[in-house]
């Protein structure tokens, strides 16, 4: 499900069962990420699928990438794998107005 930044942040803030998932490359992730995000690179192909399948399907996943395209695809893949609650951040981190962690 696609959510605007406002809705994504509001829903995430009220969700005690939330996981933030960053599907960008490791290099992109290391340039800055949303606090508490877990990085699983969607460009890894089958390895991405394997890592996603290890996640708890009972959690709610708030997914983002650079602009929203890869995270939309990740949410679609997650839905196909049986994850019922995967929320795509429209506009990605490019449009993110919140704070980021810069390692």
Spans of features found by a protein language model:
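Rhodanese-like catalytic fold shared by cysteine-dependent sulfurtransferases
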Residues: 1-19, 26-60, 66-103
């Amino acid at each position: 499900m696609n959510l605007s930044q406002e809705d994504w942040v509001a829903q995430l803030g009220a969700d005690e069962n939330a996981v933030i998932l960053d599907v960008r490359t490791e290099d992109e992730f290391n340039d800055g990420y949303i606090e508490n995000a877990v990085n699983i690179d969607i460009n890894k192909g089958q390895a991405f699928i394997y890592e996603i399948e290890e996640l708890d399907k009972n959690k709610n996943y708030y997914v983002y990438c650079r602009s929203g395209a890869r995270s939309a695809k990740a949410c679609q893949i997650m839905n196909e794998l049986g994850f019922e609650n995967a929320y795509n951040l429209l506009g990605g981190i490019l449009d993110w107005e919140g704070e980021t962690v810069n390692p």
